[in-house]
Amino acid sequence: DYRLCPENAFPAPIEDAKALWEHVQACSDDYGIDPARVALAGDSAGGLISSTLALILRDESGRQPRALCLAYPWVTTNNENQPSLSSCANTFPLTADTMHFFNSQVFPNDLNKDHPWANPLHAESLAGLPPTIIGTAGFDPIRDQGNAFASRLAESGNEVTHFCFESLTHSYLMFGRISNEAERACETLAVALSESLNASD
């Protein structure tokens, strides 16, 4: 449970994720886990936190996660050149108005809106990141930024497995019990993540 905005100013969520990563790495024996086989995963804003943390760990020469798994990730506050923000502006459950509201809560008065940690899509370099699984959704206002992030990661030489689930909406991970398509998407991402975690060195 990371500190939420607006009660806590950004980048508090990133700082909390980093503290948790360091704790898990330091106490892996206590938890009975292999510290070299830990992934970072998140959906929506959790995708922002996970991808930004991977960049921080890369730059600090710390142990990288074994893999990244990002579902419909929010990876930039810059909404230019994103047709999906208009074409899916009124799509359940995430609308363009809701996105603007979230932005206003996380970045009140645009404070820290241009912070590098809020915009991994536009990082100077995306090279040197772990194998990444990305699952975007066809009916999602932030579909285009997730697709662009997958493309930039691949162009930067990273191993990327990208699925665009064309018939699904934002938050499809929550709909597995009521939608067969969402259930299949969840299974697809889970299998891909398992394969990355268990791949030979």
Where on the chain are the PLM-derived regions?
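Alpha/beta-hydrolase superfamily serine-hydrolase fold, recognizing
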Residues: Y2-D201
